[in-house]
Amino acid sequence: MRKTIMKYLPALAGIIFTAGWFLWIDGHVYENTNNKNADFDGPHIQWIYYLPGIFATLGMVMANIVDLSALNSNSLLFDGGATKVRVWLFISFAISFGCIGAALWIMVAVFLPPHNTNDAAQWPGIAITLQTSLIFLSSLLLVFKKVRQDDEYDQF
């Protein structure tokens, strides 16, 4: 059972990643469709609202291009490889958390009341928050798969 789950974990991460971007595209299309109505008074999506998703994707790539076998080093201070990997992973996860924070900020400051009084215009803000959260979740699943793959041969 465990091997089957580990086998399909990257596919699940890809589905979650795709769902995140799909939700954001859906939110943007929803906003553009509503803007064609003459009585729509909601906020308009600007190019800067794409940045949390783009940087969350960058953080996911950064977390998954690193070789995690370098973390198995015994010496913390003398081995530069393990320290570099730890710093790289810290930066990638800091970028991902920052993107979630930026998406929450955009949602609260632009798309939710009292800044936006139109209830129909709240979906893009929710979509951008879901997007960055799902991208981060897919990144965690892929890193977990890599960690468990390294531990697969350990019996203890």
Curated annotation (Swiss-Prot):
It is a multi-pass membrane protein. The keyword Membrane applies. Its main location: membrane. The chain crosses the membrane at residues 5-25, 45-65, 87-107, 124-144. Signal peptide: none annotated. Pfam families: UPF0220. InterPro entries: UPF0220. It is found in: Membrane. Keywords: Membrane, Transmembrane, Transmembrane helix. It comes from the Eukaryota. One of its GO terms (biological process) is late endosome to vacuole transport via multivesicular body sorting pathway. One of its GO terms (cellular component) is membrane. Belongs to the UPF0220 family. PANTHER family: SMALL MEMBRANE PROTEIN-RELATED (PTHR13180). This is Transmembrane protein 50 homolog.
